[in-house]
Amino acid sequence: MKKNTLFLILLIFVIFCFIVLFKGLSKDNSYKPNINFGKKLSSFEGKNFFNDQLINSNELFSENKIYVLNIWASWCAPCRAEHSILMELKKNKVIEIIGINYKDNLKNAKKFVDEYGNPYSEILIDEDGTIAISLGAYGIPETIVVDRNQIILKKFFGAINNKSLKEINSLTK
């Protein structure tokens, strides 16, 4: 009798654990941080990738174009995967792509750009991650699309793909 009661309690506990585990695994865990679409981008500044000149973000958004800010690093595998998409996006003359090189070894980053091509009109160095933090980045790669007034139109988490390319290009029409 005692053995049966102990077995029943253990069985109920195991079933309860499976139910809790199943509920937890079936929850949607695709967390999307609050993006302030329609809000102005925080201003930032960083050193130019090629000449170390300090650039304020307000200097970058002067023409009547769509601006794509891409946070990347040479050590980031998804950044490598999306690079061909950025090269394709560069062909759209109404779009300027601004690269934010995140916590990277400058020598490796320059080698990456030389080897794979440079889709960026400007590249800023983000040595300590402060630019990415000010932009609300949660990881890399991340891509933020803004208009000339620095209003956030779209944000992509992770590597952009052909679908993202179409979405960004559609913003120019």
Where are these regions (language model features)?
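Conserved segment of the thioredoxin-like fold in thiol-based oxidoreductases
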Residues: 91-92, 96-128, 140
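Conserved redox-active cysteine motifs that mediate thiol-disulfide chemistry
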Residues: 71-88
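A short beta-strand-turn-helix
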Residues: 43-67
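Hydrophobic beta-strand anchors of alpha/beta hydrolase catalytic cores
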Residues: 68-69, 97, 143
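Short pre-active-site segment immediately N-terminal to redox-active cysteine/selenocysteine motifs
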Residues: 65-67, 71-75, 139
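Short, Lys/Arg-enriched, disordered terminal segments
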Residues: 1-7, 28-33, 58-59, 91-92, ...
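N-terminal targeting signals for export/organelle localization
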Residues: 1-47
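Thiol/disulfide oxidoreductase modules built on the thioredoxin-like
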Residues: 114-119, 126-172
